[in-house]
C-alpha cells in the first residue's frame, strides 16, 4: 500500500476529529455540519477499503500534523494568492473568428468550439488562466491557432454555468485535440498549459492520444452540434 495514501487518510481522520470537536461546541453552521456528516461517511468507506482503523489513524494523523506545525512559520500560514498567466495577447483574446464548418460541444460548464474545415495544419493551443497551488484554478479563455495565426478552435467558460475544475479543463482540451487531429492536424500545447493544465505531453508539447480516443472525441463533438 502506498505510504502517501495511508498518511493522507491519517491526516484526514485527525482533521475530521478537530472539526467534530468544533461542531460539538455548537460553533459550526449548517454547511459545515453537512460536510462533516458527508466526510464521516467517506472516511468510513476509505477505512474499509484500506483496512485501517479510524481511531488508530486519527492518532497517527495527530502526530503528523503536530510535526508540521512545529516547523511552520506565521508567514507560511498565509493563503497563497492566485497568479494570472497569459499565453495570448489582448488582441488574440478579443479577435473575432469565423468557422466554415462549425462544431460545438458543451462539456459541463465549458463550451468547446472548432472549425472542422481545417485540415493538415500545425496548431498550437494557447490559454489565459489563473493558477493556485501550482494547478489551474480558473480558465479565462483557450484558443487554437494555426502557424499563420488563424483561430480554429476555442474553449471558454459558460457565463450561465460558473465553476470548473482543472480536470474539467483537461478533459475539454482532450476533446478539442481529438477533434482537430481527426482531420490530420498536428496539435501541440503551449509550455504554460503543459505545466499547469496538461501534464502528460511528449517532448514536442503534443499530448499523446491513442487513435481510438481521437475518433471517440471527434465523434462526440460532431454528435452534439
Swiss-Prot record:
Name of one Pfam family that matches: Flu_NS1
InterPro entries in alphabetical order: NS1 (IPR004208), NS1A (IPR000256), NS1A_effect_dom-like_sf (IPR038064), uS15_NS1_RNA-bd_sf (IPR009068)
Record-level GO BP terms: symbiont-mediated suppression of host cytoplasmic pattern recognition receptor signaling pathway via inhibition of RIG-I activity; symbiont-mediated suppression of host gene expression; symbiont-mediated suppression of host mRNA processing; symbiont-mediated suppression of host PKR/eIFalpha signaling; symbiont-mediated suppression of host type I interferon-mediated signaling pathway
A Gene Ontology molecular function term of the record: protein serine/threonine kinase inhibitor activity
Record gene name: NS
Lineage: Viruses, Riboviria, Orthornavirae, Negarnaviricota, Polyploviricotina
Region (CPSF4-binding): 175-210
Chain spans, region PABPN1-binding: 218-225
Function: Inhibits post-transcriptional processing of cellular pre-mRNA, by binding and inhibiting two cellular proteins that are required for the 3'-end processing of cellular pre-mRNAs: the 30 kDa cleavage and polyadenylation specificity factor/CPSF4 and the poly(A)-binding protein 2/PABPN1. In turn, unprocessed 3' end pre-mRNAs accumulate in the host nucleus and are no longer exported to the cytoplasm. Cellular protein synthesis is thereby shut off very early after virus infection.
Keyword match Iron: no
Motif (Nuclear export signal): 132-141
The entry's keywords: Eukaryotic host gene expression shutoff by virus, Host cytoplasm, Host gene expression shutoff by virus, Host mRNA suppression by virus, Host nucleus, Host-virus interaction, Inhibition of host innate immune response by virus, Inhibition of host interferon signaling pathway by virus, Inhibition of host PKR by virus, Inhibition of host pre-mRNA processing by virus, Inhibition of host RIG-I by virus, Inhibition of host RLR pathway by virus, Interferon antiviral system evasion, RNA-binding, Ubl conjugation, Viral immunoevasion
Superkingdom: Viruses
Region (RNA-binding and homodimerization) location: 1-73
Annotated spans, Disordered: 200-225
Binding partners and assembly: Homodimer. Interacts with host TRIM25 (via coiled coil); this interaction specifically inhibits TRIM25 multimerization and TRIM25-mediated RIGI CARD ubiquitination. Interacts with human EIF2AK2/PKR, CPSF4, IVNS1ABP and PABPN1.
Full protein name: Non-structural protein 1
Amino acid at each position: 500500500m502506498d505510504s502517501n495514501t495511508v498518511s493522507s487518510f491519517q491526516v484526514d481522520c485527525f482533521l475530521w476529529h478537530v472539526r467534530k470537536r468544533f461542531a460539538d461546541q455548537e460553533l459550526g453552521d449548517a454547511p459545515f455540519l453537512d460536510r462533516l456528516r458527508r466526510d464521516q461517511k467517506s472516511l468510513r468507506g476509505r477505512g474499509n477499503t484500506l483496512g485501517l482503523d479510524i481511531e488508530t489513524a486519527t492518532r497517527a494523523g495527530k502526530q503528523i500534523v503536530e510535526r508540521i506545525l512545529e516547523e511552520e512559520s506565521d508567514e507560511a500560514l498565509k493563503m497563497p494568492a492566485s497568479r494570472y498567466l497569459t499565453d495570448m495577447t489582448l488582441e488574440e483574446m478579443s479577435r473575432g473568428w469565423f468557422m466554415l464548418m462549425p462544431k460545438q460541444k458543451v462539456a459541463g460548464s465549458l463550451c468547446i468550439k472548432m472549425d472542422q474545415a481545417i485540415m493538415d495544419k500545425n496548431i498550437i493551443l494557447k490559454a489565459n488562466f489563473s493558477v493556485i497551488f501550482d494547478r489551474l484554478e480558473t480558465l479565462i479563455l483557450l484558443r487554437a491557432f494555426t502557424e499563420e495565426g488563424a483561430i480554429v478552435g476555442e474553449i471558454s467558460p459558460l457565463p450561465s454555468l460558473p465553476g470548473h475544475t482543472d480536470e474539467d479543463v483537461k478533459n475539454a482540451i482532450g476533446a478539442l485535440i481529438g477533434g482537430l487531429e481527426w482531420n490530420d492536424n498536428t496539435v501541440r500545447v503551449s509550455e504554460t498549459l503543459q505545466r499547469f493544465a496538461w501534464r502528460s505531453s511528449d517532448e514536442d508539447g503534443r499530448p499523446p492520444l491513442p487513435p481510438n480516443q481521437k475518433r471517440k472525441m471527434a465523434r462526440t463533438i460532431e454528435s452534439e452540434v
